[in-house]
Amino acid sequence: MKKNFDDLAERTPFAIPNNIKLGITKIKSLPLPDKLDCNLNKNHICLITDDGSELTIQLANSLIKEEWQVIILSFPGSIIPQKLPLSKEIKRMILVDLTEEHLKQQLDSVINNNGLIGAFIHLNPITVSATKAKTILKHIFLMAKLLKISLNEISKSQRSWFITVTHLDGKLGLGENNNFQSITGGLFGLTKTLNLEW
């Protein structure tokens, strides 16, 4: 049901042209997305951040079935304490601190020992404190900075990915359940901006 906004012009300090219709935003259910078949070169790496949940393992196993090389990046235990056991096919890289130098050293080690990183998937943890969420966000910004060369090099010949996965309320943050840190919205801005910046 649309509301009549004709009297809105009288209540606002500016005039609204008569030919512009105003409406109320509401949530609309969308159909499930189709599957996009994407292949990563077998000589390239898919780096996934560990959110401490089964999702990390499920995603890694799904990509391995597609013959992707997967490495899991785990944050220090002070940020995400839970690290579920991985299968033999999955390598894990654990950050011992959150400095840019250490992250660069670890990424260089992955590239030198395994090949270029062609896909990065950040799985944002569901429940962390605001301080930890801010620390993770900062580190993902650093990750974007440090992966720029690798991802751009690969994109010259095939698709490369920088993906962030967040958990909201299923209603784009507009629902009643707000069991998430609002600072993680910075991930949306980061992924949106990378395409413009790179």
Residue ranges and their predicted role:
Residues 63, 195-198:
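A generic structural signal for well-ordered alpha-helical segments
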Residues 146-159, 197:
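A short helix-coil junction within the Rossmann-fold of NAD(P)-dependent oxidoreductases
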